[in-house]
UniProtKB/Swiss-Prot annotation:
Organism: Psychromonas ingrahamii (strain DSM 17664 / CCUG 51855 / 37)
Annotated binding of ATP, by residue: 18, 60-65, 257, 322, 394
Magnesium found in the keyword field: no
Protein name listed in UniProt: ATP-dependent protease ATPase subunit HslU
HAMAP family (alphabetical): HslU
SUPFAM superfamilies: P-loop containing nucleoside triphosphate hydrolases
């Protein structure tokens, strides 16, 4: 779990997301509170519940990007889901409890990676020993095999040195590996994912875990495979499961996107199985309930829920009152200005302009963006957003593709050229489309 301070978390988010300081502060505090809670004594820890967040803002301003970056920073079980994929219990579609099951699977994977990293050095030594045993077969005396384990053996040490220096990488060896388990892929009927998981587990256990298969491969590849195999033997699956369930219950973060799409609209009639019904099913999950998973029972009392939505048609007050009460922290994200769009093109790490420079550099083209060129692209994006649908920063992707369309097509024939995208270059490619509103509506 991350022990970064709120300022450090916000600073890290600033490297990738322009503006939206209120939203960054809210998620930074929420993430730090996860760490603070774990420092409390057991009795107090049970009483402190997370304050869930509702992020409100137009499309393309950074709601989903904050979630993506938070997942990398959290170093905790994190899952992002779309609210529109779920239906209420009893109807065709995924039920909301599958969110918790997916979170537990993420926690198991994360914990296994952490545990395998702890035994990596030991696994490397064991893998080297297995390779050396193949290269220098054990000596045979009488009826028994005696393994030559003496580390001061000159031959063995010589081969170990060559192995570590990579001089034996291309030599082929034959190694014993666990036989691949029979993959029985069962298409899960909606709402029955848990049962199909159990069936898959049953078929895999019938295939037998102790079977081995000989494979020929180069030493470089064999070492990687053997390190994984040895690390898997060194870790305890029961410990992994126990730690993962604790981590999911106490550090788990669930990000629910597009929550505005499950609001009941006043003019709609008939059963709303994918709207209000889903909200009612989410209530016990957010409030705290126990969900049955194939790894055991999981409590959701201390999981952090972050919901987000554009709320262009619906309003936050259209959510059922009980759900509003369970999302106490409201954060409003602002629409992007012309200056924000210009910053998005240049300031974030791996910004759009840097991505296109790197892509065209592979063809031997040196691409540069002048300041007036960047300003012109930002102004054009803002203008199209204002006159048609406002899709925020996503508009920049459309414009950049349009501006660099010809250059990308002819790049392989223009090797060695140096090209600057300035105001005139942008005007030549975009102005005709911008002036014709009907064309810009469909093309930009």
């Amino acid at each position: 779990m991350s022990n970064m301070t709120p300022k450090e978390i916000k600073h890290e988010l600033d490297r990738h997301i322009i503006g939206q300081d209120n939203a960054k502060r809210a998620v930074a505090i929420a993430l730090r509170n996860r760490w603070r809670r774990m420092q409390l004594d057991k009795e107090m820890r049970q009483e402190v519940t997370p304050k869930n967040i509702l992020m409100i803002g137009p499309t393309g301003v950074g709601k989903t990007e904050i979630a993506r970056r938070l997942a990398k920073l959290a170093n905790a079980p994190f899952i992002k889901v779309e609210a529109t994929k779920f239906t209420e219990v009893g109807y065709v579609g995924k039920e909301v409890e599958s969110i918790v099951r997916d979170l537990v699977d993420v926690a198991i994977k994360l914990t296994r990676e952490e545990e395998m990293a702890k035994v990596a050095h030991k696994a490397e030594d064991l893998a080297e020993d297995r390779i050396l045993d193949i290269l220098i077969p054990p000596a045979k005396t009488g009826n028994d095999w005696e393994t030559v384990k003496t580390e001061d053996s000159a031959t063995r040490q010589s081969f170990r040195k060559k192995l570590r220096e990579g001089k034996l990488d291309d030599k082929e060896v034959e190694i014993d590996l666990p036989a691949p388990q029979i993959g029985v892929e069962i298409m899960a009927p909606p709402g029955m994912e848990e049962m199909t998981n159990q069936l898959q587990g049953m078929f895999q256990s019938m295939s037998g875990k102790d079977k081995t298969k000989k494979r020929k491969m180069k030493i470089k590849e064999a070492l990687k495979v053997l390190i994984e195999s040895e690390a898997a033997k060194l870790v305890n699956e029961e410990d992994i499961k126990e730690k993962a369930l604790f981590s999911a219950e106490n550090n788990g973060i669930i990000f629910i996107d597009e929550i505005d799409k499950i609001c009941k609209r006043g003019d709609s009639a008939g059963p709303d199985v994918s709207r209000e019904g889903v909200q009612r099913d989410l209530l016990p999950l957010i409030e705290g309930s126990t969900v049955s998973t194939k790894h055991g029972m999981v409590k959701t009392d201390h999981m952090l829920f972050i919901a987000s939505g554009a709320f262009q048609v619906a309003k936050p007050s259209d959510l059922i009152p009980e759900l509003q009460g369970r999302l106490p922290i409201r954060v409003e994200l602002e629409a992007l200005t012309e200056e924000d769009l210009a910053k998005i093109l240049t300031e974030p790490k791996a910004s759009l302009s840097e991505q296109y420079k790197a892509l065209l550099a592979t063809e031997g083209i040196t691409l540069q963006f002048s300041k007036d060129g960047i300003d012109k692209i930002a102004k054009s994006a803002w203008h199209v957003n204002e006159t048609t649908e406002n899709i925020g920063a996503r508009r920049l992707h459309t414009l950049m593709e349009r501006i660099l369309d010809e250059l990308s097509y002819e790049a392989s024939e223009r090797k060695g050229e140096s090209i600057t995208i300035d105001e005139n270059y942008v005007a030549n490619t975009l102005d005709d489309l911008l002036e014709n509103e009907d064309l810009s509506r469909y093309i930009l």
